[in-house]
C-alpha cells in the first residue's frame, strides 16, 4: 500500500525533453483551485487563465481532451463528449509541489493490482475501418490517418499502484497521474506516454512527433534487425515525414520567419515492447505568443490525426464510434514563469468509477498510409498493447530446472536466461539471490531427481520449490491446438514467467494426453505448452525458428550448438509428412511423441 501522507492529486514524471532541460519528478497534493472547461468556448479562456497564473508564480497541471479541438478551429470535427458532466479540459493550480516525506509517500504505492481486460476491437470491424481509410487515401481525400481502437477492462486494486506498475512497464516516459475531480465528476488519468507534444521555454518551442513502429526482437540480433528495419522502411519513414511536414506548417503559424527547423529526423528509440521513430521540429515563437496560441497552432497533435488534419479528423469521426477523451489530447505542466511541457497521451488509461466498479479504457492506434495492410496494422495494435499487459498483473520470472543426485543440470544457462528476462522487464538483477537459493535447494535434496521451480521477483529476490520428478515415459501422446496462439511473438512467450494463462488455455483436458502442440496465426508450428518441439523431415531433425514465436529453451540452444537440430519454419501441414516427432526440454530431456488428434485446416 502507499505510505501514509496526503493522497496526491497529480504526479508528473517527465523525462528531460532536450539537452540542458531538467527532468521533472513532482507530486502535488490538494490544489488551491481547479479550472474546468465544460464546452469548447471555455477552453481558450481557461488556457489564458493558466498562462497568467503560471507567470504569476503558480504551478498548473492539467489536460485537454481530444474533443477540445473544436475550441481552436470550427473545422476540427470530433464526437461530442460522452458525458457532459465531465470537463473537456481541466487544470489544477498549486502553490508548489510536495516535498520531503510527503513527496516520498505520494510516489510510494506498492500494493498488488490487476486489470481484467474484457473488451477490444473485433477483427472484422478493425479490418473494415482500415479498408475505409485506404479507400479514402486512394481517392485522394488525404495522405494518412491515425486510427485508434480502445481496450476495455476493470481495475482490481488501487489506481496509484496501477500507475506505479505502468511506470515500471514503460520507464523513462512522459508519465502523469491526474485525479483532479476535487469532488466534481471527472475521470482519473494514468499516462506513460513516450511522445512529447511540445516543450516551450526560453523562446524556443520543441515538438517531437512520433510516427513509425516496429516490434522488439526475439533476441539481440533480431532486435537489431527490427531497429534497422524501422530506420529504413519506406512506409515508416513516409509516415513520419508526413507528420513532420504537418508540424512544420503548424509551427509556422506562430513562429518568427525562417525559424522552423528539423534538427533531427527519423530517430529510433528502444522502448520495452516496441521500437519507435520520432523527429524533432523546433521554432522561435513570435513575441506576444501565449499558451493558448501554441495550442491553437498545434492541437491536436498531427501524429494522432493524420494529414491533412481537417480531412483526417472527419474520417476519424466516421470510423471511431466513441470520443477519444484525454487519449490523443494533451497532459502536461506549466511551471512558474510559463515554461510548459505536454505529452501526447498515448499509452494512457482513463479510469471511471460507477460506485461499484472502476472501468478502465486504454486507446491504442497507428498511422495508416497507402501501403498499409489490415494484417500489419492489427499486428502493430497488438504490439502496442503489450505495455499494458505487462503492467496489468504482477508476475515473477521463472526457470524450471532438473536436480539429479545433487547436481542442477545446465544451471548456468538457466541463470543466464533469467538474467536476460530481468533486464528486459526492468527487474533487479536476480543472479546472486538465485544462485544462493539453488545452493540451498541442492543442500536440502542431495539424492533423487527433482523438478525445481526457481522464481525471482521485481526486487531481485529469489525463492524455489522442489517436487519429486518421476521418469518420463519413452513415448507420449500429444494433441495439436484447434486454434492458433494469438500473439505468439509476445514477450510473455519469449520470456519465461509466471504469466502463463495463454499456455494454460491450451492444456489438454484428457489426462492421457501429455501436452498440446501450438501454432501461430500464420499456421507455423511454435512449441508445446511445456517444452520445445522437434520434427524429423527428410531425414533431418528440425525445430521451429525463434521468429515463429516461442520460448528459447535451454535444451534447444544446446542441441542447436551440437548440430543435432536445425532451425526452420515448419507448418502444420508438415506434420503429415514427418517421420518423427519429439517433445524436449532441459527438465525431461528428449521424449518421443505421437500426435493423436489431427489439426484442422492449415
Task: List each model region and its residues.
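Extended alpha-helical targeting/anchoring segments
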Residues: 1-397, 404, 520
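Helix-start/capping segments and mature chain N-termini
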Residues: 240, 277, 376-380, 384-602
Amino acid at each position: 500500500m502507499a505510505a501514509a501522507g496526503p493522497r496526491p492529486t497529480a504526479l508528473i514524471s517527465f523525462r528531460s525533453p532536450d539537452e540542458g532541460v531538467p527532468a521533472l519528478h513532482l507530486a502535488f497534493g490538494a490544489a488551491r483551485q481547479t479550472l474546468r472547461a465544460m464546452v469548447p468556448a471555455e477552453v481558450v479562456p481557461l488556457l489564458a487563465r493558466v498562462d497568467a497564473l503560471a507567470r504569476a508564480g503558480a504551478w498548473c497541471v492539467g489536460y485537454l481532451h481530444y474533443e477540445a479541438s473544436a475550441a481552436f478551429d470550427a473545422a476540427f470535427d470530433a464526437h461530442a463528449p460522452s458525458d457532459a458532466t465531465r470537463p473537456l479540459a481541466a487544470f489544477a493550480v498549486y502553490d508548489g509541489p510536495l516535498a520531503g516525506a510527503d513527496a516520498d509517500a505520494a510516489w510510494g504505492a506498492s500494493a498488488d493490482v490487476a486489470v481484467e481486460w474484457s473488451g477490444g476491437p473485433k477483427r472484422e470491424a478493425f479490418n473494415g475501418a482500415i479498408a475505409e481509410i485506404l479507400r479514402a487515401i486512394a481517392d485522394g481525400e488525404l495522405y494518412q490517418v491515425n486510427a485508434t481502437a480502445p481496450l476495455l477492462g476493470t481495475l482490481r486494486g488501487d489506481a496509484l499502484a496501477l500507475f506505479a506498475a505502468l511506470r515500471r512497464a514503460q520507464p523513462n516516459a512522459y508519465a502523469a497521474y491526474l485525479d483532479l475531480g476535487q469532488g466534481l465528476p471527472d475521470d482519473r488519468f494514468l499516462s506513460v506516454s513516450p511522445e512529447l507534444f511540445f516543450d516551450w521555454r526560453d523562446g524556443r518551442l520543441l515538438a517531437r512527433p512520433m510516427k513509425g513502429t516496429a516490434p522488439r526482437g526475439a533476441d539481440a540480433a533480431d532486435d537489431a534487425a527490427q531497429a534497422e528495419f524501422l530506420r529504413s522502411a519506406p512506409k515508416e519513414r513516409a509516415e513520419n515525414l508526413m507528420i513532420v511536414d504537418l508540424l512544420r506548417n503548424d509551427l509556422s503559424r506562430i513562429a518568427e520567419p525562417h525559424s522552423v527547423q528539423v534538427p533531427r529526423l527519423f530517430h529510433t528509440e528502444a522502448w520495452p515492447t516496441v521500437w519507435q521513430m520520432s523527429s524533432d521540429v523546433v521554432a522561435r515563437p513570435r513575441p506576444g505568443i501565449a499558451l493558448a496560441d501554441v495550442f491553437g497552432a498545434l492541437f491536436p497533435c498531427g501524429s494522432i490525426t493524420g494529414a491533412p488534419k481537417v480531412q483526417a479528423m472527419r474520417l476519424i469521426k466516421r470510423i471511431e464510434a466513441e470520443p477519444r477523451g484525454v487519449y490523443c489530447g494533451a497532459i502536461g505542466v506549466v511551471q512558474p514563469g510559463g515554461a510548459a511541457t505536454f505529452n501526447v497521451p498515448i499509452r494512457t488509461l482513463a479510469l471511471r468509477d460507477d460506485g461499484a466498479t472502476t472501468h478502465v479504457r486504454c486507446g491504442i492506434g497507428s498511422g495508416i498510409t497507402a501501403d498499409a495492410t489490415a494484417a500489419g496494422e492489427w499486428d502493430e495494435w497488438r504490439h502496442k498493447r503489450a505495455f499494458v499487459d505487462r503492467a496489468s498483473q504482477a508476475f515473477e520470472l521463472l526457470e524450471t530446472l532438473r536436480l539429479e543426485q545433487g547436481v542442477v543440470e545446465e544451471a548456468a544457462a538457466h541463470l543466464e536466461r533469467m538474467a536476460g528476462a530481468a533486464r528486459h522487464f526492468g527487474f533487479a538483477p536476480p543472479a546472486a539471490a538465485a544462485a544462493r537459493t539453488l545452493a540451498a535447494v541442492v543442500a536440502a535434496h542431495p539424492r533423487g531427481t527433482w523438478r525445481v521451480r526457481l522464481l525471482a521477483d521485481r526486487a531481485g529476490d529469489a525463492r524455489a520449490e522442489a517436487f519429486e520428478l518421476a521418469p518420463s515415459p519413452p513415448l507420449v501422446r500429444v494433441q495439436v491446438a484447434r486454434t492458433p496462439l494469438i500473439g505468439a511473438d509476445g514477450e510473455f512467450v519469449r520470456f519465461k514467467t509466471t504469466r502463463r494463462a495463454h499456455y494454460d488455455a491450451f492444456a489438454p483436458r484428457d489426462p492421457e494426453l501429455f501436452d498440446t502442440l501450438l501454432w501461430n496465426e500464420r499456421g507455423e508450428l511454435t512449441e508445446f505448452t511445456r517444452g520445445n518441439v522437434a520434427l524429423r523431415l527428410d531425414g533431418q531433425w528440425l525445430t521451429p525458428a525463434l521468429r515463429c514465436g516461442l520460448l528459447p529453451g535451454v535444451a534447444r540452444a544446446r542441441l542447436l550448438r551440437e548440430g543435432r537440430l536445425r532451425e526452420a519454419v515448419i507448418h502444420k501441414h508438415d506434420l503429415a509428412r514427418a517421420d518423427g516427432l519429439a517433445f524436449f526440454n532441459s527438465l525431461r530431456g528428449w521424449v518421443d511423441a505421437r500426435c493423436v488428434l489431427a489439426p484442422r485446416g492449415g
